[in-house]
């Protein structure tokens, strides 16, 4: 059980100066990266476009989790790398739906693949949380459902500026305004961090790492 001092510290760190600066940097990255991807040199080359787009998803996932955990913490960077992997790996469902490893087939699908349904996110997160509770992994891996939520949500929000959000079984929304994508992406780590505090996850993470968390 976390002490009152740990609880107070975790609450104060949800909006520290460092994390606010980091999230502003994340917003700026979104602005610049997605504008650069519009260059004709990238758009005219399928491989370059696909790899660049996926790389941006990866960086946003890594950056978002770094904001949550604190970029100055003395733990391994494996979590941040894992967050980037989770944010980018979603796109493999393009190849599953295409039934082929052909990039051309993956980019010309008749419909959106299943991992791009936003309803999947809470289902997978809650299933993961239940599984961790069942196998008593909830302390050592308490961060994993939150990491998955942030990584996948950031991917869906970014895709939403082109295609809208696909919310099964209700259909899809209109494409998201670019400014809304930037605001949601840069504020999502803080929202999750605060909810993690309310659920006690931040305190468990602080105890696990043995250092302060700078968010």
Curated annotation (Swiss-Prot):
Domain of life (superkingdom): Eukaryota
Residue intervals passing through the bilayer: 77-97, 114-134, 178-198
GO CC terms in record: membrane
Membrane topology: Multi-pass membrane protein
Subcellular localization: Membrane
Keyword terms: Membrane, Transmembrane, Transmembrane helix
Chief subcellular location: membrane
Species whose genome carries this gene: Homo sapiens (Human)
Protein name per the record: Transmembrane protein 267
